[in-house]
Design a protein with these regions (language model features):
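Substrate-binding groove of N-acetylhexosamine-processing glycoside hydrolases
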Residues: 1-142, 249
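Short, compositionally stereotyped local motifs that mark structural "simplifiers"
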Residues: 84, 88, 94-210, 215-251
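Bulky hydrophobic/aromatic packing residues
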Residues: 45, 161-162, 259
Length: 261
């Protein structure tokens, strides 16, 4: 079932993970799968010999990224296959997993480490002050810097939300018990002034343009050929042609009070 066992799906939030077909399938979700589903009649469950995970590689284009998606969820698959449901214990599994990760290091396997999540973007704009709050999916400690350098094991440990009132770049990483760090997440925090309001005579609707092609990154839009604009009544996402491309909407919205929208 894809909700548990399609491990080509990203293991964390979309804003922290490399490109994948879907996101939000953490280790705990895979571990929680029960091969002997209650939907199977009890007198037939003994026919279930195990489970499998699916690993599609449309987006996993290198061996290193394939390993990143496979591990450690493949270890969760192994345990859920041989462990009776009543003896499954995710907390016990993750404690033992920390030792297994060291073994994976010895074999140079590029496994996933939970990334610092929380902020929905890697550039945060504010007017007076702002607060950044972080967490990760396995409650590992995190370390961070605000001087532009990459965090090390000796860097400041994240313990409370970060209150910010000046321009700064926050770099933060998750730290395993072994001292190994996750990839660094870098967030630019910028104090900005509000844009002046635009007074313009408007009509109902939004201007829509479309471009075709396989577009995975914003930079892929450079040099794109856009269709002639048309006015639509709302944000419609039903494509006129095969759904490979991007939409660009242009319009105005009413701002009732000063703020960041």
């Amino acid at each position: 079932p894809s909700k548990w066992m399609y491990i080509d799906h990203g293991q964390g939030a979309v804003e922290t993970e490399p490109i994948a077909i879907r996101f939000g399938l953490p280790l705990e979700k895979t571990y929680s799968y029960d091969p002997k589903s209650p939907k199977i009649p009890e007198n037939l469950r003994h026919h279930v010999l195990g489970a499998q995970c699916n690993m599609w590689t449309e987006y996993a284009v290198t061996p290193e990224y394939t390993e990143y998606l496979l591990y450690p969820r493949m270890l969760a698959l192994a345990e859920l296959d041989w462990t009776p449901k009543e003896k499954k214990d995710y907390n016990s599994f993750t404690r033992r997993l920390d030792n297994q990760l060291i073994r994976l290091d010895m074999h140079h396997i590029n496994y996933h480490i939970p990334m610092p999540e929380g902020p929905m973007a890697d550039r945060i704009a504010y007017t007076e002050n702002t607060t950044l709050t972080f967490h990760n999916s396995r409650n590992y400690p995190m370390v961070y810097t605000t001087d532009g350098s990459d965090p090390q094991t000796s860097s400041t440990k994240y313990e409370n939300p970060l209150h910010i009132n000046k321009d700064v770049t926050v770099k933060i990483a998750t730290m395993l018990p072994s001292g190994k760090l996750s990839p660094v997440r870098s967030i630019e925090v910028v104090r900005e002034k509000l844009m002046p309001a635009t007074e313009k005579s408007t009509q109902p609707g939004i201007e829509l343009r479309r471009t075709e092609g396989n577009l995975y990154f914003v930079k892929d839009l450079d040099g794109a050929h856009w269709s002639a604009p048309k006015v639509v009544k709302d944000f419609e996402f039903k494509p006129d042609i095969e759904d490979k491309g991007a939409y660009c909407y242009t319009g105005y919205f009413e701002v009732p009070a000063d703020g960041i929208y």
